Amino acid sequence: MNSQGSDRKAVTLLLLVMSNLLFCQNAHPLPICPGGNCQMPLQELFDRVIMLSHYIYMLSADMFIELDKQYAQDHEFIAKAISDCPTSSLATPEGKEEAQQVPPEVLLNLILSLVHSWNDPLFQLVTEVDGIHEASDAIISRAKEIGEQNKRLLEGIEKILGQAYPEAKGNEIYSVWSQFPSLQGVDEESRDLAIYNKVRCLRRDSHKVDNYLKLLRCRVVHNNNC
């Protein structure tokens, strides 16, 4: 095994261990707050959420690499598979400079919309991947893990929004996933094409979420001094 592969596995394992501590009050007790309304410091909350978002991105990237290996030489398949992601309907900023121009509370709601939009598609993806006989155990386990961790990420982002910008809660817009209907009863090629594109979109969106959260931490917690 090459050193790059070893490093990747080591980092993934570390993120898995650390993610189990996220939002765990037993491992990280929340500070005692007046009136019993306890909240952890915003910086710590950002740190935990970003650790989890990066973990999800790494899992989705690894899952896409596993799928891509199967079709790397089939250029016709890849050309057919790649289509617009349903979340493209969300007007998310392209690049750091554009994201810097978006008010923090608006960007947080966009992040929340992206993460929330994946809840049902991830549930479908787990079922679809689990039904593929040739799917590796690694792909199946990653799909299940991402589905579970996405719920926790959603919870963490909602906590950040509620603590930093409570007046902005409820302004998120969720995309409609009509392009990804159930794959039950479709032929094998159509199923594989749809799953490939769904995982590709998952990797793209999880990378966006991870980058946006890191940018927001710098702006909100460190006043752009990072």
UniProtKB/Swiss-Prot annotation:
Main location group: secreted
Matching InterPro entries: 4_helix_cytokine-like_core, Somatotropin/Prolactin, Somatotropin_CS
CDD domains: prolactin_like (cd10288)
Keywords noted in UniProt: Disulfide bond, Hormone, Lactation, Phosphoprotein, Secreted, Signal
Annotated positions of the Phosphoserine modification: 53, 117
Domain of life: Eukaryota
GO CC annotation terms, alphabetical: extracellular space
Transmembrane spans: none
Keyword Phosphoprotein listed: yes
Disulfide bond positions: 33-38, 85-201, 218-226
Reported function: Prolactin acts primarily on the mammary gland by promoting lactation.
Self-association and partners: Interacts with PRLR.
The protein's name in its UniProt record: Prolactin
